[in-house]
């Protein structure tokens, strides 16, 4: 379910050494399955463990996950990265905003999942997002851009060189992608 690197485990163990005996960590998702989903890690004293929690045992600690958060933390990774600027704890949870779909799910659901878990996190850096409107009978994914992508002069490159290549590689049954957006350049546009 969750992978915690050795460096992150060592970091947590150091922090837990200063807590009440038996305290571990809790990994959770607030607003799971929504565009506003946020992941977090907190201390979990022994009296805060619920009967419905999943206990994930690691070499140096135990991570507790509540029943509601569990499916959204599938494939999550926690790491502790040190570089020339300092140290930072990272938590990547590709399924926090949307539950992972089965490999045999309908094409529409699989494409929507790819957009939400892989493509939109990249576009979010520019204040943008893309939504799947439909998949045509001819096999074209019809997309609509929003936020910083609407009116951006680079949207055609993003669509053809980024999104289309990635989706066609992952979903060979697609023939291409089309942009439904009526682009209006404004202060919200990234470029």
UniProtKB/Swiss-Prot annotation:
InterPro entries: Fe/S_biogenesis_protein_NfuA, FeS_biogenesis, FSCA_dom_sf, HesB-like_dom_sf, NIF_FeS_clus_asmbl_NifU_C. One of its GO terms (biological process) is iron-sulfur cluster assembly. Pfam families: Fe-S_biosyn, NifU. The keyword Cytoplasm does not apply. Binds 1 [4Fe-4S] cluster per subunit. The cluster is presumably bound at the interface of two monomers. [4Fe-4S] cluster binds at residues 149, 152. Keywords: 4Fe-4S, Iron, Iron-sulfur, Metal-binding. Its cofactor is [4Fe-4S] cluster. Gene3D superfamilies: Fe-S cluster assembly (FSCA), HesB-like domain. GO terms for molecular function: 4 iron, 4 sulfur cluster binding; iron ion binding. SUPFAM superfamilies: Fe-S cluster assembly (FSCA) domain-like, HesB-like domain. It comes from the Bacteria. Belongs to the NfuA family. Homodimer. Involved in iron-sulfur cluster biogenesis. Binds a 4Fe-4S cluster, can transfer this cluster to apoproteins, and thereby intervenes in the maturation of Fe/S proteins. Could also act as a scaffold/chaperone for damaged Fe/S proteins. This is Fe/S biogenesis protein NfuA. The gene is nfuA.
